[in-house]
């Protein structure tokens, strides 16, 4: 399946910290590069990266039925965020903001 999830975590949170927090909740995590991490659970796989200006980006694949769960999880961790779920044509079909 092609990537269907993209988003931003506000506040310039380091990708390693995002991965560490998700790991403590049972997600499988690993370093993807010098500046990015990957996190995976049975219903979602994301890459977490940080741009030169400090914006924390996420993108990956999620079971569309779980986007609310991911948004609630990020909110519970205190992360302001925006998430976009796209269909197979790349059109945004759902958005979540906290």
Predicted segments with their positions:
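Short, extreme N-terminal segment that most often corresponds to the first beta-strand
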Residues: 1-25, 97-98
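A general secondary-structure signal for short beta-strands and their flanking turns/coil
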Residues: 2-4, 55, 76
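Ordered hydrophobic segments in well-structured contexts
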Residues: 6-8, 57, 82-84
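Short, well-ordered alpha-helical microsegments
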Residues: 15-16, 66-68
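Intrinsically disordered, low-complexity regions enriched in Ser/Pro/Gly/Gln/His and often acidic
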Residues: 20, 36, 72-73
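Short secondary-structure junctions
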Residues: 23-33, 81-83
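Short, intrinsically disordered low-complexity segments
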Residues: 28-66
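Acidic, proline/glycine-rich low-complexity IDRs
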Residues: 68-98
